[in-house]
Swiss-Prot record:
Pathway: Pyrimidine metabolism; UMP biosynthesis via de novo pathway; (S)-dihydroorotate from bicarbonate: step 2/3. One of its GO terms (molecular function) is amino acid binding. L-aspartate binds at K86, R169, R223. Belongs to the aspartate/ornithine carbamoyltransferase superfamily. ATCase family. Its EC number is 2.1.3.2. It catalyses: carbamoyl phosphate + L-aspartate = N-carbamoyl-L-aspartate + phosphate + H(+). The gene is pyrB. GO terms for biological process: 'de novo' pyrimidine nucleobase biosynthetic process; 'de novo' UMP biosynthetic process; amino acid metabolic process. Keywords: Pyrimidine biosynthesis, Transferase. This is Aspartate carbamoyltransferase catalytic subunit. PANTHER family: ASPARTATE CARBAMOYLTRANSFERASE, ORNITHINE CARBAMOYLTRANSFERASE, MITOCHONDRIAL. Catalyzes the condensation of carbamoyl phosphate and aspartate to form carbamoyl aspartate and inorganic phosphate, the committed step in the de novo pyrimidine nucleotide biosynthesis pathway. It comes from Acidiphilium cryptum (strain JF-5). InterPro entries: Asp/Orn_carbamoyltranf_P-bd (IPR006132), Asp/Orn_carbamoylTrfase (IPR006130), Asp/Orn_carbamoylTrfase_sf (IPR036901), Asp_carbamoyltransf (IPR002082), Asp_carbamoyltransf_Asp/Orn-bd (IPR006131).
Length: 311
């Protein structure tokens, strides 16, 4: 398969058939990873640079693993020790990296639109690994893969996304993907953390947690993005947990076989209770991490093929 463009900057613009094809390819990489084998021929001779302007554990590490398992030369660029810390602009950094002739550039940045700007300035294929409050496409893809593997489909499912919706790029990308694939999406949280107009994107808004979770197939908890918040949006973390923290009592409103998800990192006792997070029968949080490697292998594979087609 090939994507419409040589970059992956967001879910917006991806056709449902592209999403399905990426998920299908990722399925094959799940099996490959579990077998302990690699496909080092896929990206042999290609260079992948991870350029992260924000902290990351799961995303950066899984892209590194994905690249190495496909045979790429992977470079993790430390922004804190790079020329960026000395005042170099994003565009100058882009020009420098472009001169090095890398093939794949994975970018995380606090500013919405930064990966799209880089994509205009470099010859490499650019993958958005999270930009501000805008999008996090590979997170939505791995979430979709996790859901599909457990439920068999995305169409017709009711997915409740709970917590800090306003500041979450994960919520936006999931909303775009899930509605495109036929899921019914609810967003649940206090009025201060639900962006106005989100219903125009196909979401149903709930401010009562129990009502929002009623008969849901999937419950996705999101952390409070305190680094992006202004003061006064919530009274306290303790009060937030009382009304919007995912615990066993609130989860009981969902379907008996509802799955619990969280993109990480988790703040236990704030947006999710440990009992729920660690419930082996319902929580697929660790499976999400595993699916992250497979979906990123699929994305790197497809973008490498797409780049050849656009060459």
């Amino acid at each position: 398969m090939r994507l419409p463009t040589r970059h992956l900057l967001g879910i917006e613009g991806l056709h449902p058939r592209d999403i399905s094809a990426l998920l299908d390819l990722a399925e094959s990489y799940v099996l490959l990873n579990r077998s302990g084998k690699t496909r080092r021929d896929v990206l042999r001779g290609r260079t992948l640079i991870n350029l992260f302007f924000e902290d990351s554990t799961r995303t950066r590490t899984s892209f590194e693993l994905a690249g190495k398992r496909l045979g790429a030369d992977v470079i993790n660029m430390s922004v804190s020790t790079s020329s960026v810390s000395k005042g170099e602009t994003l565009l100058d950094t882009a020009a420098t990296l472009n001169a090095m002739n890398c093939d794949l550039l994975v970018v995380r940045h606090k500013a919405s639109g930064a990966p799209a700007l880089l994509a205009q300035k470099v010859d490499a294929a650019v993958i958005n690994a999270g930009d501000g409050m805008h999008e996090h496409p590979t997170q939505a893809l791995l979430d979709a893969l996790t859901i599909r593997r457990n439920k068999g489909t995305l169409a017709g499912l009711t997915v409740a996304i709970c917590g800090d919706i306003a500041h979450s790029r994960v919520a936006r990308s999931n909303l775009l993907l899930l509605t495109a694939m036929g899921s019914r999406v609810r967003v649940v949280g206090p009025p201060t953390l639900i962006p106005s107009g989100i219903d125009q994107f196909g979401a149903t808004v709930f401010h009562d947690m129990r009502e929002g979770l009623r008969d849901a197939d999937i419950v996705m908890a999101l952390r409070l993005q305190t680094e992006r918040m202004s003061a006064g949006l919530i009274p306290s973390a303790r009060e937030f947990f009382t009304f919007y923290g995912l615990d066993a009592a609130k989860l009981a409103m969902a379907k008996p076989d509802a799955l619990v998800m969280h993109p990480g990192p988790m703040n236990r006792g704030v947006e999710i209770d440990s009992q729920v997070a660690d419930d082996a029968t319902r929580s697929v949080i660790r499976e999400q991490v595993e699916m992250g490697v497979a979906i990123r292998m699929a994305v790197l594979d497809v973008l490498a093929r797409t780049a050849l087609a656009h060459a």
